[in-house]
Amino acid sequence: MIPTSFPPREEIARLTARMLLEIQAVHFRPHEPFTLASGLPSPTYIDCRKLISYPRIRATLMDFLTVTLLRDAGFEAFDNVAGGETAGIPFAAMMAERLALPMTYVRKKPKGYGRNARIEGVMTEGQRVLLVEDLTTDGGSKLSFVDAIRDTGATCAHTAVIFYYGIFPETIGRLQAHGVTLHHLCTWWDVLAEARASDAFDAGTLAEVECFLSNPRDWQDARKPADPAAGL
């Protein structure tokens, strides 16, 4: 069923952050940083995949994402909902159900046998496709999925995520340059504010996280592993 009420953006962001904290999807570890896919260190990590195990929370967040899209993109803006492999697939299925639209998913790369396809499900030329993922950091992986969708002759001008890092200023511009608008529910800044309000972490940890969020590149550069070749 399509939601008919439209909560304020600020309330959606606050409640989304609260739910992520409640299920312990948020991890802050400034003194033993996580390693991102890029190889760079980060004191923050978020596991949106956990959401699928919490029916009330996942339903609420999908309602939030639905009303965000209806308000910002339009009520008749899409013909197909595509999930990005792997984390985006369950959320795309839930969004397709709410929007009463066909659902497909996009592989990261062709599987190498059979049809050797990147698109699974039925996607046809001219369809307006919404790309759904769990989160985005710098937007890079979204561009690959968008290109695969467009290669079918469909269009893709919107991507929707639950969580957007919101700390890399080039992200929005990169997506816009590719003709894609990003829709999201909350950012690290929303999570930090809610973490402070809930006393979920100690003050020292939150101060270090804020330092990272304010200038992630400098924080990472100061903590990158030393290059073994540098001393040769």
Swiss-Prot record:
Transmembrane segments: none annotated. Pfam families: Pribosyltran. Disulfide bonds: none annotated. One of its GO terms (biological process) is pyrimidine nucleobase biosynthetic process. Pathway: Pyrimidine metabolism; UMP biosynthesis via de novo pathway; UMP from orotate: step 1/2. Keywords: Glycosyltransferase, Magnesium, Pyrimidine biosynthesis, Transferase. Orotate binds at residue 137. GO terms for molecular function: magnesium ion binding; orotate phosphoribosyltransferase activity. The keyword Magnesium applies. Its cofactor is Mg(2+). The keyword Lipid metabolism does not apply. 5-phospho-alpha-D-ribose 1-diphosphate binds at residues 107-108, 111, 133-141. It is an enzyme of class 2 (transferase). InterPro entries: OPRT (IPR023031), PRibTrfase_dom (IPR000836), PRTase-like (IPR029057). It catalyses: orotidine 5'-phosphate + diphosphate = orotate + 5-phospho-alpha-D-ribose 1-diphosphate. Homodimer. Belongs to the purine/pyrimidine phosphoribosyltransferase family. PyrE subfamily. Catalyzes the transfer of a ribosyl phosphate group from 5-phosphoribose 1-diphosphate to orotate, leading to the formation of orotidine monophosphate (OMP). PANTHER family: OROTATE PHOSPHORIBOSYLTRANSFERASE, URIDINE 5'-MONOPHOSPHATE SYNTHASE. This is Orotate phosphoribosyltransferase. The lineage of its organism: Bacteria, Pseudomonadati, Pseudomonadota, Alphaproteobacteria, Rhodobacterales.
